[in-house]
Amino acid sequence: MNKNEKMVRSLMGTVVSNKMNDTVVVRVERRVKHPKYGKFIKRSTKIHAHDKGNGCQIGDIVTIRECRPISKTKSWTLVKINERAEKVE
């Protein structure tokens, strides 16, 4: 990594909505340890990400990275689609 490059946060998640134009909603899951009982619990966050060209479908597993604010709710952009969802007919 060069001096000029910044560390950029990137996350993996599942697309849960693609109804907006150039925007997808990605659910990112994380595991958190319960403070009292010590059991690991799944917690999720829904993030709005910029999808130039509307290439994602619901159920796709994608990688997103943080960027400058694009709109009021979008500060993440789509990097790549890791796995396509299977089409059920």
UniProtKB/Swiss-Prot annotation:
Pfam families: Ribosomal_S17. InterPro entries: NA-bd_OB-fold, Ribosomal_uS17, Ribosomal_uS17_bact/chlr, Ribosomal_uS17_CS. GO terms for biological process: translation. Gene3D superfamilies: Nucleic acid-binding proteins. Keywords: Ribonucleoprotein, Ribosomal protein, RNA-binding, rRNA-binding. Part of the 30S ribosomal subunit. Belongs to the universal ribosomal protein uS17 family. This is Small ribosomal subunit protein uS17. It comes from Coxiella burnetii (strain Dugway 5J108-111).
